[in-house]
């Protein structure tokens, strides 16, 4: 039976920590299928040989995601996530549009 690890970059502490876990998983022939955060995990799954699948959420079904990411992750004709090609993670965050969802801001003094 194939083992699959549901490693989440936000839970693990970031991209570097996720990559360390991915390397350990690969050494044990474990596949990776991270949970959520498609804007991060699409890149990570595509970057490792043991990346199996990334979850996809339609931003139109979630008001916060729709406000946060005006240009959602796209799918190709086969239903596969198209990894953004723009610099960084390839997505723009609309900070002013998500301010109503914030419970705390580092700007609060």
Enumerate the language-model features and the residues they cover:
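C-terminal extensions of enzymes
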Residues: 68-109
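Shared catalytic-loop signature of beta/alpha-barrel
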Residues: 1-80
């Amino acid at each position: 039976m194939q083992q699959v690890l549901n490693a989440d970059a936000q839970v693990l502490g970031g991209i570097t920590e996720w990559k360390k876990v991915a390397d350990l998983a690969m050494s044990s022939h474990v596949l990776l299928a991270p949970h959520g955060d498609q804007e991060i995990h699409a890149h990570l799954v595509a970057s490792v040989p043991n990346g199996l699948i990334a979850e996809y959420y339609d931003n139109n079904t979630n008001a916060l995601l729709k406000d946060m990411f005006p240009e959602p992750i796209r799918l190709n004709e086969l239903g596969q996530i198209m990894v953004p090609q723009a610099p960084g993670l390839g997505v723009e965050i609309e900070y002013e549009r998500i301010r109503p969802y914030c419970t705390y801001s580092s700007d609060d003094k």
